[in-house]
Amino acid sequence: MIKAAEKASKSVIRDFGEVEKLQVSKKGPYDFVTKTDKNVEKILIEELSKSKKHYSFITEETGKINNKDKENFWIIDPIDGTTNFLHGIPHFAICIAHMSNNEIISGLIFDPIKDEMFFSEKNKGAYLNNQRLRVSKKNSTEDCLFSSNHEGAKFSDLNMRCSGCAALDLAYVASGRLDGFFHNKINIWDVRSEEHTSELQSPMYL
């Protein structure tokens, strides 16, 4: 899983450099980013299939891919935070999760720009680049910093931020950088790796 994300990240970083140049072009970066999304997904599927060739897939771009093993799934979001990527904002992540019999066994969130690998595995905890994660211990919401999507940011009495990348928001909750996360529209490929990382840390997220 980690090797797959690292290999795919090379393509992401290269294309992100090109996206920044396309911001001022007449054609714009939209088609280019769509191709990047699909290419990264293709790399992840190929790499993950090398170690577990019979596992099935649930992906953002392709949808469900059934293989011989229909109890084990790789869940993939090639680029979470696509809008950020599209506009040349360096805040997005590659997300992978392993689901077995409808239970998440492990999850990964990789920020290729900052080279931060958030990884969690059942009964083994959650880590950032091999360092054990610790959530915030704050008890008062007045001292907390939360993150949300636009439609969920209706809490005027809270310190709220909107980063544009749900995966990193939840990873930041798990690592104590953020104190909570609110999101009202999320798909299975958006949440499974992040959810697993965060659940292991028992954060406040709704």
List the predicted regions and their residue ranges.
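N-terminal subdomain of lithium-sensitive/metallo-dependent phosphomonoesterases centered on the IMPase/IPPase/PAP
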Residues: M1-I79
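Residue-level signal for inorganic ion chemistry
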Residues: V12, D37, L48, T82, ...
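Generic detector of well-ordered alpha-helical packing
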Residues: K38, E61, P78-G81, P112, ...
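DPxDG-like acidic metal-binding loop motif
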Residues: K68-Y127
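A structural micro-motif at secondary-structure boundaries
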Residues: L128-R132
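An extended, acidic
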Residues: R134-H196, S202
